[in-house]
Amino acid sequence: MSNIHDHKILILDFGSQYTQLIARRIREIGVYCELWAWDVSEAQIREFAPNGIILAGGPESVTADNSPRAPEYVFNAGVPVLGICYGMQTMSEQLGGKVIQGVGEGEFGYAQIELQTTSALFKSIEDAVSAEGKPLLDVWMSHGDKVSAIPDGFVTVAKTATCPFAAMANEEKGFYGVQFHPEVTHTRQGQRMLEHFALDICGCKANWKPSSIIEDAIERLKKQIGDDEVILGLSGGVDSSVVAMLLHRAIGDKLTCVFVDNGLLRLNEAEQVLEMFGDHFGLNIVHVDAENRFLDAMAGEAEPEAKRKIIGRVFVEIFDEESKKCANAKWLAQGTIYPDVIESAGSATGKAHVIKSHHNVGGLPADMKMGLVEPLRELFKDEVRKIGLELGLPYNMLYRHPFPGPGLGVRVLGEVKKEYCDLLRSADAIFIEELHKADLYNKVSQAFTVFLPVRSVGVMGDGRKYDWVVSLRAVETIDFMTAHWAHLPYDFLGRVSNRIINEVDGISRVVYDISGKPPATIEWE
């Protein structure tokens, strides 16, 4: 088996919002990479032994005092280096070039660069050709400062009307700088540039693929766990489901999954989880029906944060009780993924990301004397989904819209009662079913129903009814940091509303939430 970590790229983070996207793009090429703070030590780089280094973008100005710099060793490590945006500017400045502060003439958004010479980074890439016969590329810019003089040994590879050095290269050393962002989809050929860098220039092999990741994870789990037993909190969500399947492959019936039904799940969700993992895949599952315990604990509480804390506390209590029954379990498995491990924090400047020692996702008791098993901690969410498919989990489950940890506890506004949860479950199921029927489910990023603790007058037949109100919510987003409300067709919304009011006894009115994020959040609570 080829070692999937043998060929790898190191990405140094200077604080750009796109840095994780660079890592995901490199992984998509099939090459392993890690994301580290810009102020990493020479010893750490030597130990990691990357085949190439990428200097990512960032919000700082190279011209400012004490702005972040790449470690000098980066340029003496004998491996290719690619500087992106701020990364190009600091490369240029550190190697003897010049950077000037932008004064009202930065480039933000779409731009077209004109290639001036051939380069390994841009081999056989063009979107159009200029009148003079030079290749043109559509790219995405986001910079104020710019390079005004390139270092000795470099050549100008590309320019724009306002940026004389949109790309530079020292082919002999394998140093490249681009002022634009190849990692965003607006740069049409960006992925091909990153492929050229990782595969051709750095010489990496594309070993990082789902089947190899699974093989490697199983081998490492067997080595870590040996003949011990493992306990896992299985929620039915993507991360815990994939962890369950990996562990089942690695250690079989030495895995015990604890599934806690808190009464705050979607319609028939508990039955689906038990059927899929218990009956179909044959995992050892302990089913805890704790609906009354959760609802009793939340009785009378209307404040969202307090509800979240109660739900978290009761889950921990139950999991602790169940883990004590598994006396032989030496390991606790968690669905920690790579973005959980990368945490914005204070290095010397407060401008870097640091790596946590571990991320205790469930907030489990500190006195649980178990080792931690986190087989997904190197993976991004999209990678977790891909290996889930490879492990045989259904597409519809892996690519379902996000569901909050506290479940319906934060989709029932105010106090949570069984009656409200039951009404909400039924209404939400109709909304989701109709989205699938209309082929709209995968065209929105997230859709759900919210129960409002207000009654509204309605008319059914000749009678007057005074029942509850629900709101439909659907959004479109790329990163969930900002979102637009989804412009669903009126006839579709009318159909959903009619079905809910006619089929769910207790709901008299349906409204549609047309708030964007910001100012509103995606979830109501």
UniProtKB/Swiss-Prot annotation:
Active site per UniProt: C85, H181, E183
Keyword Nucleotide-binding part of the UniProt annotation: yes
Family annotation (Pfam families): GATase (PF00117), GMP_synt_C (PF00958), NAD_synthase (PF02540)
Source taxon at top rank: Bacteria
EC number: 6.3.5.2
Reactions performed catalytically: XMP + L-glutamine + ATP + H2O = GMP + L-glutamate + AMP + diphosphate + 2 H(+)
GO terms for cellular component: cytosol
Pathway linked to the protein: Purine metabolism; GMP biosynthesis; GMP from XMP (L-Gln route): step 1/1
Claim: Membrane is one of the keywords in the record: no
Domain GMPS ATP-PPase intervals: 208-400
Binding site residues for ATP: S235, G236, G237, V238, D239, S240, S241
UniProt keyword list: ATP-binding, Glutamine amidotransferase, GMP biosynthesis, Ligase, Nucleotide-binding, Purine biosynthesis
GO molecular function: ATP binding; GMP synthase activity
Domain Glutamine amidotransferase type-1: 8-207
Main enzyme class: ligase
HAMAP family given in the database record: GMP_synthase
Function noted in UniProt: Catalyzes the synthesis of GMP from XMP.
Self-association state and partner proteins as the record states: Homodimer.
Protein name: GMP synthase [glutamine-hydrolyzing]
Source species of the chain: Shewanella frigidimarina (strain NCIMB 400)
